[in-house]
A protein has these predicted regions:
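Fungal secretory targeting signals
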Residues: 1-23
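Non-catalytic, mobile gating and regulatory segments of ester bond hydrolases
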Residues: 19-156, 160-284
Length: 284
C-alpha cells in the first residue's frame, strides 16, 4: 500500500483503528532460519515496484503483468538458482490501487481451474484485480512448467501485492496440484471471510505471512465489524535474522496483532531487511 496521498492514508488509518480490536495471545518462537527466504521475498517484492525488465535479482522475467483498468501489476519468471517459477505482485502506487485496497465489499470469487466452496467470500478490491490477470498468470506458469518441469512454484508480494498473493497461492495450488508451492505474502491485509481462510489454509503448499514491526496494515479489517480472516503462518521481524520469530496462530500478540498499529504506518515500508522501492532489480 505504498502511496503518496497522505490525507487519504491518514483517513484509512483512523477507520482501521476504529474497526480493529483483536483478542490476543502470545506464543511466538525464534525462527532465524526462515529469514533468508523472507529477505529474498522482500527483494523481489521491492523489485516489483521498480518495473524491472529482464531480471529481478535471481528471477529471469518472462512476462510483465500490467492491467491498466484494474491497476494490477507485477511479473512472472523463473530462477535457475532456486529452481523456482515465480509470480511476483506489486503493491499500491496509484489511486486505482488505493481504491482496491479499501474496497471491502464481499463477493463470491469465480476463477478458471479453482473450485470454491459456496460460502467463500473475498473482498471485491482483490477479486477484481486478480480476476483480470488470472488466466494470463495460469497460462504463463503452465508454459514455464513445460520448459522447467522440475521447478517448484512460488508467489510473492508486498502490501496490496501481498493481498493478491493470498489469492495467487490458491489459484496456483488448485491449477497445479502436483507442483510444490511456497508463497510469501508480505505486509498484507486479510482479504476474506472465515470460510475463505479455512479453504485457502487447506490448500497444498506453504503459505507464509511476513510482517515487519510497527506495521499496521496486517491488522486492517480484523475486527468484529469487518472481521476478515488471515490464513497461513506468520513470521515477524524488525529487519534482522536474530529478530525473526514464528508466530502462533493468526492473532499472536508477540507479532503484528500486538503491535498496536493499524493501517499504513512507518513500519509498512520495510520488510525483512529491505526498504521497499530501494532495492532496485539486483542485476543489470
Amino acid at each position: 500500500m505504498l502511496f503518496n496521498c497522505q490525507s487519504l492514508l491518514v483517513g484509512i488509518s483512523l477507520i482501521s483503528q476504529a474497526l480493529s480490536a483483536p483478542i490476543l495471545e502470545s506464543r511466538a518462537t525464534a525462527a532465524a532460519s526462515a529469514f533468508p527466504d523472507l529477505h529474498r521475498a522482500a527483494q523481489l517484492s521491492s523489485a516489483a515496484y521498480s518495473g524491472c525488465r529482464g531480471n529481478a535479482f535471481d528471477v529471469t522475467i518472462t512476462k510483465r503483468i500490467n492491467d491498466l483498468l484494474t491497476g494490477t501489476d507485477g511479473f512472472i519468471g523463473y530462477s535457475t538458482e532456486k529452481k523456482k517459477i515465480s509470480v511476483i505482485m506489486r503493491g499500491s502506487t496509484s489511486i486505482v490501487d488505493l481504491l482496491n485496497d479499501i474496497d471491502i465489499h464481499l463477493v463470491t470469487p469465480s476463477l478458471s481451474g479453482v473450485t470454491f466452496p459456496p460460502d467463500v467470500k473475498i473482498m471485491r478490491g482483490i477479486n477484481r484485480p486478480w480476476s483480470a490477470i488470472h488466466d494470463t498468470v495460469i497460462a504463463e506458469v503452465k508454459s514455464l512448467i513445460a520448459k522447467y518441469p522440475d521447478y517448484t512454484l512460488e508467489a510473492v508480494g508486498h502490501s496490496l501485492g501481498g493481498a493478491l498473493t493470498s489469492i495467487a497461492h490458491v489459484a496456483l495450488a488448485q491449477n497445479f496440484p502436483d507442483k510444490e508451492l511456497t508463497s510469501n505474502a508480505l505486509a498484507a491485509f486479510p482479504i476474506g471471510n472465515e470460510a475463505w481462510a479455512n479453504f485457502a489454509g487447506s490448500q497444498p503448499g506453504t503459505f507464509n505471512r511476513g510482517n515487519n514491526v510497527l506495521d499496521g496494515v496486517p491488522n486492517m479489517y480484523s475486527s468484529g465489524l469487518v472481521n476478515f480472516k488471515h490464513y497461513g503462518t506468520e513470521y515477524y521481524s524488525s529487519g534482522s535474522e536474530a529478530s525473526c520469530v514464528k508466530c502462533e496462530g493468526q492473532r499472536d500478540r508477540a507479532c503484528s496483532a500486538g503491535n498496536g498499529m493499524y493501517a499504513v504506518t512507518i513500519g509498512h515500508f520495510s520488510s525483512f531487511g529491505i526498504t521497499m522501492l530501494t532495492a532496485g532489480c539486483g542485476r543489470l
